[in-house]
């Protein structure tokens, strides 16, 4: 909305041009989302969110019992309200915003249910949401992607792009959800991912000269999705103020599923599947490897990582005696190293 107001009034009053700046709108989205979440989340979570019932087999699950959970149903609508103000809206962006809310609502219904929903029900819902998002992004046309170590691009037919996109978004949703078991962990790792994606989408993929210099594609809507990424990073900053150890509330499935969904979508919008490792490698290893272990054992009777407990944060807490702050700091340091190292390789070795 603000973008279009700026477009209409910039000739009448020069300072209104500021509202047409994606950089300004990204900063405004970050600050507004962060402030609203920091200011109002505890009040609404205490009043409207259910109490955590603990996770079966999770390490130190008893410490979370009784705290407000499902806080995502509070901060995701705040995030969406800000997006309606700061984004140069398109039908695609509106669709992504709507699906983010859908993911949050279904997660919240599971959070507040007296009996946890079955894995297959939640998996099927995630699959439908992932399919809708992939079709919304790529349509039924061939999609061009770019790969590491080559300046050439690859065309994927919809018969290949749609299944791969669905699998990626579904994995992002569930890996992020599995990581939400340590105070501040999923929020910190995800906020790092969104900041990196925001920088890539705005400064590189959404910038004509920079994308040409680095021999990567230029996307006209890259800066728009950069605003979205920075706004979610701000939202998570406000949430982490209250989720820092020892936490006073938790995002629950209402937050982690919506957050994972948006993370998956933004990686697709970047056009390079390997960015998933760059921005969210620790999230994928921590939560996604456990999904792989369970799937192989359940459907193919193949056992892997027999001596490792998943999610990996439970393994290091129980078997390595890491404290919660140690898990958070060490996982974050590994992700920082992965992001900086792999990003240089991805962008410069072409």
Per-region residue spans from a language model:
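"…together with the soluble PPM/PP2C metallo-phosphatase catalytic core" -> "…together
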Residues: 2-285
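Cytosolic, membrane-interface loops and tails of multi-pass inner-membrane proteins
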Residues: 39-65, 291-322
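Solvent-exposed interhelical
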Residues: 181-195, 305-313, 317-328
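Alpha-helix N-cap/helix-start motif at coil-to-helix transitions, marked by capping-box chemistry
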Residues: 231, 286, 306-310
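Hydrophobic alpha-helix feature that most strongly marks membrane-spanning transmembrane helices
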Residues: 242-246, 259, 267, 271, ...
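Final/C-terminal transmembrane alpha-helix of multipass membrane proteins
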Residues: 325-346
């Amino acid at each position: 909305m603000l973008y279009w107001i700026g477009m209409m009034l910039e000739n009448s009053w020069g300072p209104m041009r500021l509202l047409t700046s994606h950089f300004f709108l990204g900063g405004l989205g970050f600050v507004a989302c962060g402030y609203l979440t920091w200011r109002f989340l505890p009040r609404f979570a205490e009043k409207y969110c259910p109490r955590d019932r603990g996770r079966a087999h999770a390490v130190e699950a008893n410490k979370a019992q009784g705290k407000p959970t499902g806080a995502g149903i509070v901060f995701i609508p705040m995030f969406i309200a800000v997006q309606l103000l700061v984004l140069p809206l398109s039908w695609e962006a509106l669709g992504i915003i709507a699906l983010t809310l859908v993911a949050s609502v279904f997660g919240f219904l599971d959070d507040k249910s007296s009996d946890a929903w079955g894995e297959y029900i939640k998996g099927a819902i995630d699959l439908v949401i992932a399919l809708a998002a992939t079709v919304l992004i790529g349509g039924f046309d061939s999609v061009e992607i770019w790969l590491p170590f080559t300046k050439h691009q690859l065309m994927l037919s919809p018969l290949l792009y749609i299944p791969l996109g669905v699998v990626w978004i579904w994995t992002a949703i569930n890996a992020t959800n599995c990581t939400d078991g340590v105070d501040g962990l999923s929020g910190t790792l995800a906020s790092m991912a969104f900041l990196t994606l925001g920088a890539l989408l705005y400064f590189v993929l959404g910038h004509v000269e920079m994308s040409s210099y680095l021999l990567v594609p230029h996307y006209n809507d890259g800066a728009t999705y950069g605003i979205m990424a920075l706004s979610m990073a701000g939202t998570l900053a406000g949430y982490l103020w209250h989720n820092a150890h020892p936490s006073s509330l938790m995002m629950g499935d209402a937050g982690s599923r919506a957050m994972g969904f948006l993370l998956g979508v933004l990686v697709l919008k970047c056009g390079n599947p390997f960015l998933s490792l760059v921005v969210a490698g620790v999230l994928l290893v921590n939560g996604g490897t456990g999904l792989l272990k369970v799937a192989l054992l359940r459907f193919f009777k193949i056992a892997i990582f027999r001596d490792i407990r998943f999610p990996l944060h439970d393994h290091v807490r129980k078997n390595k005696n890491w404290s919660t702050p140690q898990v958070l700091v060490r996982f974050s340091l590994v992700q920082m190293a992965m992001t900086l190292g792999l990003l240089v390789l991805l962008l410069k070795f072409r």
